[in-house]
């Protein structure tokens, strides 16, 4: 709903179902065991916010509050302390997720665009504990430059804040730990070969940052992806 020439209000309410992944159902090796008894996640939630735009429409700033309740939230647990084998499980009761997101989009010139966003999230399970591996702070920022009519390039920086996880010790005890925050930088270039065909190359994790999304499992270092994207 437009409140003013430069201000829009927006809101939504809805429910969603998220089925377990194939990996969660069937596992993928001896250390991640499938769980065929998993139930789908069911959530009910909504958001409300305001979008502010400049007169020329080249810059916008959005602030949104969101909240949802999740039933049967999918998490993981260790089932063998000797091999550290784990499996996906449904959490009991309802989990709560709420937070605020702010986002900026700008067109600096006809060829140069930029964006930035930040999300603050609070999570709690039915017992009041913070959900595992859900960062409170997430941020992204980037630039895209159309060098020529066919050639473009972009740069992106993303920040992931600290997350809670569970440490399983050789003595069969557990305790909560915080995974450290990390920042990644990525570069990309694309070339339009034809109206319906674009070739692209991405250099991800430019500075070869070592990080973990799950305690004990390192993620990819510096890597390159090259591909073709077509439209019909």
Walk through the language-model features, giving the residues of each.
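Flexible, solvent-exposed coil segments and beta strand-coil junctions
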Residues: 23-32, 75-86, 118-124, 164-171, ...
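Gram-negative outer-membrane beta-barrel transporters
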Residues: 66-69, 87-168, 198, 207
């Amino acid at each position: 709903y437009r409140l003013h020439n430069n201000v829009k209000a927006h809101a939504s309410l809805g429910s969603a179902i998220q089925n377990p992944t194939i990996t969660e159902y069937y596992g993928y090796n001896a250390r991640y065991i499938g769980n065929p008894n998993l139930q789908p996640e069911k959530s009910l939630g909504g958001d409300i916010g305001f979008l502010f735009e400049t007169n020329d429409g080249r810059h916008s700033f959005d602030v949104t509050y969101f909240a949802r309740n999740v039933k049967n939230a999918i998490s993981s647990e260790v089932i063998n302390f000797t091999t550290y084998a784990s499996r996906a499980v449904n959490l009991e009761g309802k989990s709560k997720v709420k937070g605020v997101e702010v986002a900026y989009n700008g067109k600096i010139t006809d060829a140069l665009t930029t964006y930035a966003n930040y999300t603050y999230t609070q999570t709690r399970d039915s017992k009041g504990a913070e959900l595992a591996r859900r960062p409170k702070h997430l941020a992204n920022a980037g630039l895209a430059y159309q060098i020529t009519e066919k050639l473009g390039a972009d740069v992106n920086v993303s920040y992931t804040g600290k997350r809670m996880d569970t440490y399983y010790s050789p003595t069969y005890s557990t305790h909560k730990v915080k995974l450290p925050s990390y920042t990644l930088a990525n570069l990309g270039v694309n070339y339009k070969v034809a109206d319906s065909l674009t070739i692209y190359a991405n250099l991800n994790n430019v500075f070869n940052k070592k990080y973990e999304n799950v305690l004990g499992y390192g993620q990819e270092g510096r890597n390159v992806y090259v591909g073709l994207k077509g439209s019909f």
